[in-house]
Amino acid sequence: AMDTVRSAALGIWVGGGSREETPEESGAAHFIEHMLFKGTQRRTAQDIARETDAIGGQMNAFTTKECTCFYGRVLDDHLPQALDILFDMVYCSSFAQEAVETERGVILEEIDMYEDTPDDLCAEKLFGAVFAGSPLARPILGREETLAPMTGAFLKAYHDAHYRGDNTVVALTGSFSQEVLEDIRRRFSALPAGKAPAPVPAAYTPAFVATPKPIEQNHLTLAFPGLDYNSPKRFALQLLSAILGGGVSSRLFQQVREQQGLCYSIYSYGAGHAETGVFCIYTALNKETEAKALATIRRVIDDFLANGPTTEELERAREQSKANVIMGLESTQSRMSHAGRSLLFSGEILTPEQILDAYDRVTREDVVALAQEIFDWDRASLSAVGQVRTEEEYRQLVLG
């Protein structure tokens, strides 16, 4: 509860996401996310839209490789009705075949949009290569050939098998009454018991992949094995990422962009999954500056491995990360997201104080040891999109 607000954020989090799909089911989890807005046994799609607008609410959803989330934000007075709409959508969808045909076309357009978004495509091709042979390699949206045979009956069967009580978290933050809590408990207890099928484990394998696209800039993602999302080292990883590529004072931004003008955009990030992860450095630049930029990135990493961070860098990264936590948890929406994601993935919710304390406890030695664990050049990978070189040429540029 947040006593100083008049709104509430509500989310239904379903574990699994696209990584629970078989190759033939690729895209089903995301297809279902779309279909749950298209009508229930009690409401048409227009009813859902009109009722949501009538209470001044916002409803949306997203699918990742690990989960699907349906969420809404409303004034506290309208929370009971929002709760009814959301549970009706998520658990009583009609999966009408006519709506399936229409929505398939929408998703195919969404796939085309991603094909035309080179930074997203670059990451997707990277994951497809380093996790080849596992569900983590497949795109969340699926492909035209996997979506084509999906019917309403197929999607409903997939939904019923995966949307189980033991696989679901309901998160509520903001201003709400005890009656609303009781309503959630009652609805949640009525959900079918059981868990969804366990996902197939994935493991990182180094890979180089080049995807030709007729665009002006080349988009590069350099990657190394990372951490799973529950790793106790994840706070050290955040500080490492902040120092290397987390902002305008970071080493990569300063040395690749500010000092040499080799790119416009460059940053680093960690992508964690249940049992594995990837640490990525992304940049967008002209083909003529690729070689120099990649050499600079390697030099920055090797210098960090040899000398570690300065005291000033470490404290700046710590304060930056702690500020992001505090500012990020001041809205009902972000706090709901933190609670739902944490409970679904780790079974516990760390308080803001616990998170800040975890950052305070990270030492310089922790960050240096983690960098030495991650930055093994023999396990480096790269995805390139644009006016690309060959994969072997990129291998030579990265590995020397």
Per-range role (PLM):
Residues M2, G11-W13, K195-R251, V388:
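His/Glu-based metal-binding/catalytic segments typifying zinc-dependent metallopeptidases
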Residues M2-T4, A271:
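Short polar/acidic secondary-structure junctions
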Residues T4-R6, T64, R164, I215-E216:
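Short strand-connecting beta-turns/loops that link adjacent beta-strands
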Residues R6-R73, G246-L262:
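M16/MPP (pitrilysin/insulinase) zinc-metallopeptidase core fold and M16-derived inactive scaffolds
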Residues E20-G27, D228-L240, L244, V248, ...:
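Short alpha-helix boundary/capping segments
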Residues A45-P199, A210, L227-D228, A236, ...:
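Charge-rich, well-structured scaffold segments of protease-associated domains
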